[in-house]
Regions:
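Structured alpha/beta or helical-core interaction and ligand-binding surfaces enriched in interleaved
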Residues: 1-136
């Protein structure tokens, strides 16, 4: 049995900006919404898996250590995605095979410490990280 990482970005993003943002990233996000990701998780699908790994058991997400390179590359990716025209959010979850998301949380990227957030992410929780520009 294995862990898998799932996720999506909202529809309507600028494709050229997106390609630049994810260049050299190990994570690839298809466009979709909460229902798309949850359906994929429930059916053990692959359309919304965000890695091409056989499994994601060795992921640093949820392992309580903020000094992992994987988390730093994920932080860099999120900061790059923030620059994509039309982006509103990214969805991400870490699920044990055949276990569905039993919880959902929404946060804004400007309100979190990204490394700490991902180091302490819970399994089977779908996180919606809002990336739009906040105006104070």
């Amino acid at each position: 049995m294995c862990y898998f990482l799932y996720g999506a970005v909202n529809n309507g993003i600028n494709d050229d900006d997106y390609k630049i943002a994810i260049k050299n990233s190990e994570y690839i996000f298809n466009c979709g919404d909460i229902n798309d990701v949850n359906d994929c998780v429930e059916n053990c699908g692959v359309e919304y898996r965000i890695t091409t790994n056989h499994c994601d058991c060795d992921t640093a997400i949820g392992q309580k250590h903020t000094n992992k390179e994987e988390l730093k590359s994920l932080e860099k990716l999120l900061l790059n995605l923030k620059k994509v025209r039309g982006i509103k959010y990214i969805l991400i979850s870490k699920n044990w095979v055949e276990e569905t998301n039993n919880k959902q949380e929404t946060v804004h990227i400007d309100d979190i410490d990204i490394l700490h957030f991902f180091a302490n992410a819970e399994d089977n929780c779908l996180y919606k990280i809002e990336l739009y520009k906040k105006y104070y």
